[in-house]
Design a protein with these regions (language model features):
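Extracytoplasmic/periplasmic solute-binding protein
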Residues: 2, 16-67
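Short helices/loops that flank or line small-molecule/ion binding pockets
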Residues: 22-30, 101-116
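Extracytoplasmic/periplasmic substrate-recognition and gating elements
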Residues: 131-202
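Conserved C-terminal helix/tail region of periplasmic/extracytoplasmic solute-binding proteins
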Residues: 168-177, 185-284
Length: 284
């Protein structure tokens, strides 16, 4: 970031200036396809970007699945993402042509990709190893939330919910209750949190700065959460494992091909709406 003459994204975030327009300005300044420089890599950045509009493609409202494929902000967001393709402004790492559709950790580590979309586990599994190998300073690896939509009333981010399910017919109900309770106690115990923080620093090379930022981003009060149910309407038309399915094509299609969102929507909307109607009918 510093070598490219760019502002620190985290500092922009803290000042309330980390927005789509700021991000796009940075993207165009950094990207240089002729010299292998790109702004973004990762498996599904388009999904997280859509959630910054505050509206998911498919929401759950009053117990029913609701489509928002015609939402103007979603269309605006995906049109922005369309510009990343190599048929447009060439802002994303061309993993489809350069790396067999796989994101490149090495290109990021070599400073050729500015942002890499992934979870915090990627630091422990991959980035810290580059840090050790290359003897980087602590501030060589950082992260930032997805930018806020310009003019948004709140700062929205994609969120998900992890659940511990009780299987029908389970025999050890008391054990299930004890597991739930122990998780609840552990999550609210400051001594356990402190011990976990020290373990993260000692075993996984986290710094206090990164852990502080991670705590900020994980705090439910920091952002307004957006839950997208688009991948829960059937493996045949909605799964991240196959980008050619109808639901994934709505977001990944424009990002990876440069074709318009409206063209993908026209192709798949009827099929998706029919599935939502089918699922909603089962709970009437």
């Amino acid at each position: 970031v510093e070598e490219a003459g760019l502002d620190d994204p985290w500092e922009l975030y803290e000042k309330g200036e980390w927005t789509w327009s700021t991000f796009m300005e940075m993207a165009r300044k950094f990207s240089d396809p002729e010299n292998g420089k790109y702004v973004l890599d990762g498996y599904n950045p388009e999904d997280s970007f859509v959630c910054t509009t505050g509206t998911p493609l498919v929401s759950l409202e009053g117990g029913k699945l609701v489509s928002h494929m015609n939402d103007a902000n979603i269309e605006k967001c995906i049109d922005m993402l369309r510009s990343f393709d190599n048929t447009q402004e060439q802002l994303r790492y061309p993993r489809d042509t350069e790396n067999s559709w796989t994101p490149s950790y090495n290109e990021w580590a070599d400073g050729n990709t500015l942002f890499f979309e992934d979870g915090s586990w990627r630091y422990e599994e991959t980035w810290r190893k580059f840090k050790k190998k290359n003897k980087w300073e602590d501030d060589e690896v950082n992260f930032v939330p997805f930018p806020q939509m310009d003019g948004a009333d709140k700062y929205y981010q994609s969120m998900k919910q992890d659940s511990i399910m009780l299987v029908a017919g389970a025999k050890n109900i008391d054990g299930y209750k004890a597991w739930i309770y122990s998780n609840l106690v552990a999550s609210n115990d400051p001594e356990i949190a402190k011990a976990g923080r020290e373990q993260s620093k000692e075993e996984y090379d986290w710094s206090d700065t990164l852990l502080d930022r991670l705590d900020t981003m994980k705090d439910p009060k920091t952002f307004s959460g957006v839950f997208d149910f688009k991948n829960g309407i059937g493996q045949d038309i909605a799964t991240k494992d196959n980008q050619d399915n109808p639901v994934e094509q709505l977001t990944k299609g424009p990002y990876m091909t440069g074709e318009s969102y409206t063209s993908f929507r026209a192709t798949y909307q009827g099929q998706i709406d029919a599935r939502l109607a089918e699922l909603n009918k089962t709970v009437e």
